[in-house]
Regions:
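Mg2+/Mn2+-dependent nuclease catalytic core
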Residues: 169-175, 475-494
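Conserved catalytic cores of phosphodiester-cleaving nucleases, focusing on short active-site segments
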Residues: 436, 460-462, 466-477, 491
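Active-site metal-binding core of divalent-cation-utilizing nuclease and nuclease-like domains
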Residues: 140-144, 439-465
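Metal-dependent nuclease catalytic cores in nucleic-acid-processing enzymes
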Residues: 178-185, 339-347, 437-442, 487-507
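Domain-level recognition of nuclease-like catalytic cores that cleave nucleotide substrates
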Residues: 496, 502-525
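Phosphate-binding site recognition
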Residues: 1-428, 443
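Structural motif
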Residues: 149, 467-471, 505
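Feature representing long, continuous alpha-helical segments
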Residues: 430, 434-438, 468, 486
Length: 525
């Protein structure tokens, strides 16, 4: 038996062959793969967020369709598959297609050349890409006697990266030209599988392949990517225990922290099983640390392209309503901010009814990453200017150093409510509330804005591992810090938190009515 200390976690590995041959841990999805190929539809599209295991899934499909029985020994599929046919497979990884027409054509040209060499095809020098694609599919079928499987990974990558540039329409034209052949060559094809993040319906994959099944919301595929609670218990208990020991936490506490930070995705209204982000979970178990892996994965880079003024709209994204057709059928370019945020993994399904879906943040990691991304635009400062002040604020709030924390916050918000013209439609106190809550969310604290209790509405509660801050904001011309602390005490805002083991601190903050920033503060005691 392998010593649990030396079990190999597949951090960053996307090759199913490498995972199996080099003895990395593998969460067995092979039964779902078999069901999809043998019992599902012929043409399939699956949308999942970035870093959610789509490429490993495509690689698993390729190995299965090529009949690599040796790689599946001991997995669930061995009880299902009897024939192990070796289908010809054509695989395209569109994440290598760049962000302009020339790079896209160059990638397809090189990939088609590989398959032309494999099947001894000599293309006409003047042949269009679509003609070459057809020749590859038809020849592969004729030479092997088996219909062809076509796997297209990250189909939307060139379209995402060219969005809102002159190259986007050119890239769309390439897609229409090349991939329309998939419908025309139906007689030669066994199985088509396409993955992506965002859905552009106006290209040939969706407008021409009108028989393409969007399996993204189907209950039987809700867990085809990602890791479930049950799969953690089956596969990762030794790593969970090691992480507990390394941090002096109980196993239950470690589990609860991982769940709060990386779990919470739901992909089907008819199968609301919780799904962890596999990239973040495996990285956390490997490093034995709970940190934000999402932000470093490149998942936030496209946000400004698809959402205008996101920094002003964050509070509206929690528990937002979306019509079912919008979420399941609409084009990302016209479906609104909520659609992009769902497809890219910032939001997930929280509930559904006959009126549509309720969306919200899946977990703390994603919520923090989103707030971090928009903070520079809101604070009108560069990321480098903000980082050191954020680090100080996080440390001081975590250790109960009130004066030092308030001075860091003061430096972060100086002049912002006055200078940021995007805030002009808000009243001044609302501007401060937005800015301060965004800053606190961006450093990963648990923040509730305008929390209702029996005696009133608290402006803000902020929770760290050792402290709970009950905060009231007041403009100077509305009584300032004195009125704020009196309100905390008179309305007993701290009482609901007294049973918590953490120390409760009431804090009145005085703000300049002209938007020049934080003036003073006072503890409520």
């Amino acid at each position: 038996m392998t010593d649990s200390r030396f079990r190999r976690l597949p951090v960053g590995i996307q090759s199913f062959k490498v995972i199996r041959e080099e003895n990395y841990l593998y969460v067995d999805k092979s039964d779902i793969v078999w069901n999809m190929v043998n019992l599902g539809d012929k043409y399939n599209y699956l949308s999942r967020p970035r870093r959610f295991g789509k490429s490993v899934l495509v690689d698993t499909l390729e190995s299965y369709l090529e009949g690599r029985k040796d790689l599946f020994e001991g997995l669930k599929i061995m009880q299902l598959e009897k024939d192990w046919k070796q289908y010809p497979v054509i695989r395209l990884d569109m994440s290598r297609g760049g962000a302009n027409e020339d790079t896209l054509r160059s990638y397809l040209n090189l990939r088609f050349k590989d398959y032309e060499e494999k099947y001894n095809i000599t293309p006409d020098p003047t042949a269009m890409l679509a003609d070459r694609f057809h020749a590859i599919i038809a020849t592969a079928y004729k030479q092997t006697g088996l219909r062809v499987a076509v796997l297209i990974d990250e189909y939307d990558s060139p379209l995402q990266h060219s969005w809102r540039t002159p190259e986007h329409e050119k890239c769309t034209g390439v897609y229409r030209e090349v991939f329309a052949i998939l419908k025309a060559d139906d007689e030669y094809e066994h199985f088509i599988f396409i993955t992506g993040i965002t859905k552009f319906t106006q290209i040939s994959l969706f407008s021409v392949l009108n028989n393409l099944s969007n399996i993204s919301f189907m209950p039987e595929y809700a867990t085809i990517c990602g890791i479930t609670e049950e799969e953690i218990k089956e596969n990762f208990m030794p790593e969970l225990k090691q992480m507990s020991e390394a941090n002096n936490w109980s196993v239950q506490e470690t589990h609860d922290r991982l769940k709060a930070y990386y779990d919470g995705y739901h992909f089907s209204r008819r199968n609301m099983v919780d799904v962890y982000n596999p990239y973040s979970l495996v990285n956390a178990l490997k490093s034995k640390e709970i940190i934000n892996f999402w932000a470093s994965s490149g998942a936030t880079s496209l946000l400004p392209k698809f959402i205008d003024n996101a920094e002003l709209r964050l509070s509206k994204f929690e528990n937002c309503s979306v019509m079912r057709n919008t979420l399941e059928l609409s084009d990302v370019s016209g479906g609104g901010a909520e659609l992009f945020l769902y497809q890219s993994g910032y939001l997930t399904i929280k509930d559904s009814d006959e009126f549509g879906y309720i969306l919200g943040f899946p977990n703390e990691e994603v919520k923090q990453a989103l707030y971090e991304t928009v903070l520079p635009a809101l604070a009108m400062r560069s990321e480098s200017e903000i980082l050191s002040l954020q680090a100080c604020l996080y440390r001081y709030l975590g250790t109960g150093q009130i004066d030092e924390a308030m001075n860091s916050l003061k430096a972060l918000i100086a002049d912002v409510p006055y200078s940021n013209k995007k805030l002009a439609s808000m009243d001044m106190e609302e501007r401060y509330r937005l800015i301060i809550s965004t800053i606190l969310n961006a450093i990963g604290l648990n923040v509730e804005v305008e929390k209702m209790i029996s005696t009133g509405r608290i402006d803000m509660t902020v929770k760290t591992s050792r402290y709970i801050y009950v905060i009231e904001l007041k403009l100077r011309n509305n009584g300032g810090k004195v009125a704020a602390t009196e309100q905390i005490l008179n309305r007993q805002y701290m009482e609901p938190f007294k049973a918590d083991k953490r120390k409760v601190i009431g804090l009145g903050i005085e703000l300049d009515e002209n938007g020049k920033g934080l003036l003073d503060w006072k503890r409520a005691e």
